[in-house]
């Protein structure tokens, strides 16, 4: 990848961790889940979660949310930033941010979904981040935090080791409604996962990642906020996933095709596609239909990628998106996609 990234230094136990709501302020709507998430976060990391004025303020303005992000970067005691959840309007927050503050004191940022906006903003500043980690989804609900999430959370914030990305063997599309007290104690309905699907030549690729939630990437490109030419992704690893909006496979294919027409697909050496959610609280097809929907998205994406870059190593099914358990992955940091051994390794330095 032609663009070099700064990797922020790790936090240490006792440091402050900013907990922000750059999109939807889920802690204000569902405080019980949030408070359990904060207790678990402190126990698992030894860090001190610090909330800001809009962390629990549902409906806060874009400028107010941006002020909290700027304040977190400006505070030398804060050694990491965690977004509680995504949403659908973070694109309006980005113009209010002060890039000089982030450049002056880069910090690990973790978030998923709509936080793709912040990841790409940091990318434009030359700062690596970590895709995943929404506390309201992965730390607060259920009887405990999933092992793969704990390991990648600690690696991203504290330890910086190299981890093999493996399949947890089970997955859920959606948890119990957070308004239900049972959400504090139980996971959603989980089902066995399928083996990951591999395509492309049998070769090993190592490169920095770029990507995020596919729908949000489309917004960012439409707004003209990708700061480099597609050639800047040369040799990199594209990571893409789809949201709880449950886009039909053909619409997913249209977005991926647009990436191809922009030159992104031909630039990268590998593509990781997350296991997609195919159900929610109101739409729960039978198991066979859910499997078919996942297969349709897989086949559509692989077909489009292969047209633009038949030499790309492609792996489909990796749980780094909107399903749970979730791996947090580097964004701007290196990942090895080994098409020979069919293994994936992520470097969290």
Language-model features: where?
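Internal helical hairpin/lid segments
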Residues: 222-296
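Short, acidic/small-residue loops that bind anionic groups at enzyme active sites
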Residues: 97-124, 128-137
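ATP/nucleoside-binding phosphotransfer catalytic cores, i.e., glycine-rich phosphate-binding loops
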Residues: 269-349
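ATP/NTP phosphate-donor binding region
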Residues: 1-77
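N-terminal glycine-rich "phosphate-gripper" loop used for MgATP/nucleotide binding
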Residues: 82-91, 112
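Conserved beta-alpha junction segments in alpha/beta enzyme cores
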Residues: 22, 29-37, 197-240, 245
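Conserved anion/nucleotide-ligand pocket segment
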Residues: 131-215
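A short helix->loop->beta-strand "cap" motif at the edges of active sites that frequently abuts
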Residues: 77, 102-108, 127, 268-269, ...
């Amino acid at each position: 990848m032609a663009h070099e990234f700064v990797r922020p230094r790790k936090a240490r136990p006792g440091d402050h961790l900013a907990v922000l709501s750059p999109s939807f302020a889920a802690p204000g709507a569902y405080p019980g889940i949030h408070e359990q998430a904060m207790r678990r976060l402190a126990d698992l990391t030894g860090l001190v979660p610090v909330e800001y004025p809009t962390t629990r303020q549902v409906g806060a303005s874009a400028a107010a949310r941006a002020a909290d992000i700027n304040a977190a970067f400006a505070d030398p005691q804060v050694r990491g930033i965690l977004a509680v959840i995504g949403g659908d309007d973070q694109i309006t927050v980005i113009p209010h941010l002060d890039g000089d503050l982030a450049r002056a004191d880069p910090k690990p940022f973790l978030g998923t979904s709509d936080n793709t906006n912040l990841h790409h903003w940091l990318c434009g500043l030359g700062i690596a981040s970590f895709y995943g980690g929404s506390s309201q989804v992965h730390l607060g609900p259920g009887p405990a935090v999933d092992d793969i999430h704990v390991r990648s959370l600690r690696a991203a914030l504290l330890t910086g080791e190299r981890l093999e990305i493996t399949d947890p063997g089970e997955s859920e599309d959606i948890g119990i409604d957070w308004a239900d007290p049972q959400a504090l104690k139980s996971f959603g309905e989980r089902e066995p996962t399928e083996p990951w699907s591999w395509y492309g030549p049998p070769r090993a690729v190592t490169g920095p990642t770029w990507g995020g939630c596919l729908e949000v990437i489309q917004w960012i490109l439409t707004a003209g906020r990708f700061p480099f030419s597609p050639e800047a992704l040369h040799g990199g690893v594209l990571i893409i996933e789809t949201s709880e909006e449950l886009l039909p496979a053909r619409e997913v294919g249209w977005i991926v095709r647009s990436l191809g027409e922009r030159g992104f697909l031909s630039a990268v050496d590998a593509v990781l596609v997350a296991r997609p959610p195919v159900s929610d609280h109101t739409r729960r097809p039978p198991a066979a239909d859910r499997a078919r929907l996942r297969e349709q998205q897989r086949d559509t994406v692989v077909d489009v990628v292969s047209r633009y870059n038949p030499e790309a190593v492609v792996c489909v099914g990796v749980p780094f998106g909107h399903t749970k358990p979730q791996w947090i992955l580097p964004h701007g940091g290196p990942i090895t996609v080994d098409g020979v051994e069919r293994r994936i390794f992520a470097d969290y330095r």
